[in-house]
């Protein structure tokens, strides 16, 4: 079994990507937080992944590259709640409440994204918050604040 120990780049940086045979390794958002991963690709080849502790996999990361072939990480869609607050005060209130539940979160300029949880959805409904439930491809995995570096 081949064990990958480094990230060679990202497929978005490859100009002539159509000239390569691409073998995909599909991972969940939770998988990419593990230190050691053993998984089969979409071509039923078993691989190990063991990166340095400070390295995190992202969608499109290349683990193998030669003149003809790429082995690429593909993150699966994650079931999330995308919260758009009407005011900064409302966002602070929501973030405070979800923080008390130890919910991992990601932020954009205008939105808070959290993993789907029916109790969180009920809280948002009860408080008439603007939100949508969607399945999206996260750029990186959810982490708790203590895990963030």
UniProtKB/Swiss-Prot annotation:
InterPro entries reported in the protein's UniProt record: UreE, UreE_C_dom, UreE_N, UreE_N_sf
Family statement: Belongs to the UreE family.
SMART domains in alphabetical order: UreE_N (SM00988)
Cellular component, GO annotation: cytoplasm
Origin species: Ureaplasma urealyticum (Ureaplasma urealyticum biotype 2)
Swiss-Prot/TrEMBL GO biological process terms: protein folding; protein-containing complex assembly; urea metabolic process
Alphabetical UniProt keywords: Chaperone, Cytoplasm, Nickel, Nickel insertion
Protein name: Urease accessory protein UreE
Chain segments annotated as transmembrane: none
Main localization (coarse): cytoplasm
GO MF annotation terms: nickel cation binding; unfolded protein binding
Function recorded in the entry: Involved in urease metallocenter assembly. Binds nickel. Probably functions as a nickel donor during metallocenter assembly.
Subcellular locations according to the entry: Cytoplasm
């Amino acid at each position: 079994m081949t064990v990958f120990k480094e990230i060679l780049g990202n497929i978005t940086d490859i100009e002539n990507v159509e000239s390569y045979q691409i073998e995909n390794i599909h991972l969940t958002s939770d998988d990419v937080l593990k230190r050691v991963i053993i998984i089969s690709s979409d071509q039923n080849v078993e691989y190990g992944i063991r990166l340095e502790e400070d390295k995190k996999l992202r969608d499109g990361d290349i683990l193998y590259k030669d003149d003809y072939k790429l082995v690429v990480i593909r993150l699966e869609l994650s079931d999330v709640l995308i919260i758009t607050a009407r005011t900064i005060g409302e966002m602070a209130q929501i973030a405070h409440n979800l923080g008390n539940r130890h919910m991992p979160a990601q932020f954009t300029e205008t939105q808070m994204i959290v993993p789907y949880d029916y109790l969180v959805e009920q809280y948002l409904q009860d408080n008439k918050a603007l939100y949508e439930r969607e399945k999206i491809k996260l750029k990186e995995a959810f982490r708790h604040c203590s895990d963030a570096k």
